[in-house]
């Protein structure tokens, strides 16, 4: 049995489902953290199956190792160290390092 719909339709539907699952993970986190982790796992499975990239602002909200939904101060720690934002998962201890960019050069003029 073949898949119905074009590639762009399936990609669009997958992105909608991923964003819905992340919003559910955020809203249910205070009541049930395991359900939030399940939503993240489901969103990642959808992205892998349809070969869709999860947007960067959503990628920073989960742990790649244990699929935990990261909330700063509860399941994740956010620190700035040597020009990087370091996000640490408090469930498994995994670190994500995100470089920060500067908008000006060393002499104070803006980059173009």
Curated annotation (Swiss-Prot):
Catalytic activity line of the entry: Endonucleolytic cleavage of RNA, removing 5'-extranucleotides from tRNA precursor
Key word Metal-binding present: yes
Superkingdom of the organism of origin: Archaea
Principal cellular location given in the protein's record: cytoplasm
GO biological process per UniProt: tRNA 5'-leader removal
Listed cofactors: Zn(2+)
Assigned EC number: 3.1.26.5
Function: Part of ribonuclease P, a protein complex that generates mature tRNA molecules by cleaving their 5'-ends.
Family: Belongs to the eukaryotic/archaeal RNase P protein component 4 family.
Subunit text: Consists of a catalytic RNA component and at least 4-5 protein subunits.
PANTHER family (UniProt xref): RIBONUCLEASE P PROTEIN SUBUNIT P21, RIBONUCLEASE P SUBUNIT P21
Name of the protein described by the UniProt record: Ribonuclease P protein component 4
């Amino acid at each position: 049995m073949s898949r119905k719909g074009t590639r762009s339709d399936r990609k669009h539907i997958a992105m909608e489902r991923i964003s819905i699952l992340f919003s559910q993970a955020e809203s249910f986190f205070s009541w049930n953290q395991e359900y939030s982790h399940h939503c993240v796992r489901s969103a990642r499975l959808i992205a892998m199956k349809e070969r869709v990239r999860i947007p960067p602002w959503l990628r920073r909200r989960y742990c790649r190792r244990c699929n935990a939904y990261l909330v700063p101060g509860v399941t994740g720690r956010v620190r700035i160290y040597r020009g990087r934002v370091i996000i640490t998962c408090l469930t498994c201890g995994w670190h994500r390092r995100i470089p920060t960019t500067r908008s000006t050069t060393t002499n104070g003029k803006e980059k173009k």
